[in-house]
């Protein structure tokens, strides 16, 4: 077992019972090929929760400052985390994400770009659409996290059916249009869960 899967099993063993994680829709994940997982963002725990519930190893961007700490500099790459310089158009991070997708790997992102602690869904940033369009044959798997995170209170994680980006590519749609389509899929997952209460 490599370090990534070891860490995943340890974190899963802690977070699953603590937040009574209720996960559905993992069968929608393609077993191979590039996948961009796009989720709403309600708390700092979202990246590890998506990481431990996704059925395939998932790569995330994290602010470059985290890599300045010696321990994290060595640890984060083993957790499939790569640096991004926030507030800049970081070409290295962009190239890394696109390369991972074209290589048939999974990249996770939170299109809102910031946490929405009230649980409402914000506007998605065009980066999600950009990566979806530029990532070769990448498909998008929408994800909804329904909280809040409170110990021993159920947190729901829902993965939706893959969104095929081919029609958008064929008609040369822009990144913003693709992002809006992605956000709509996330919104539908959230609304479906809330209406089921």
Question: Predicted segment positions?
Answer:
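Secondary-structure boundary/capping positions in well-ordered alpha/beta enzyme cores
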Residues: 21, 56-57, 82, 104, ...
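Catalytic core of membrane glycerolipid acyltransferases/transacylases, capturing the structured
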Residues: 3-9, 13-17, 29-88
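Residues at the C-termini of beta-strands that transition into short coil/loop
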Residues: 27, 64, 85, 144, ...
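Aromatic-capped interface at the extracytoplasmic side
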Residues: 17-24
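A residue-level signal for beta-strand positions that form part of recognition/binding surfaces
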Residues: 20, 34, 57, 137, ...
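Short amphipathic alpha-helix with an adjacent loop that forms part of the alpha/beta core around
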Residues: 27-29, 98-99
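Glycine-rich, highly charged phosphate/nucleotide-binding loops
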Residues: 22, 89-93
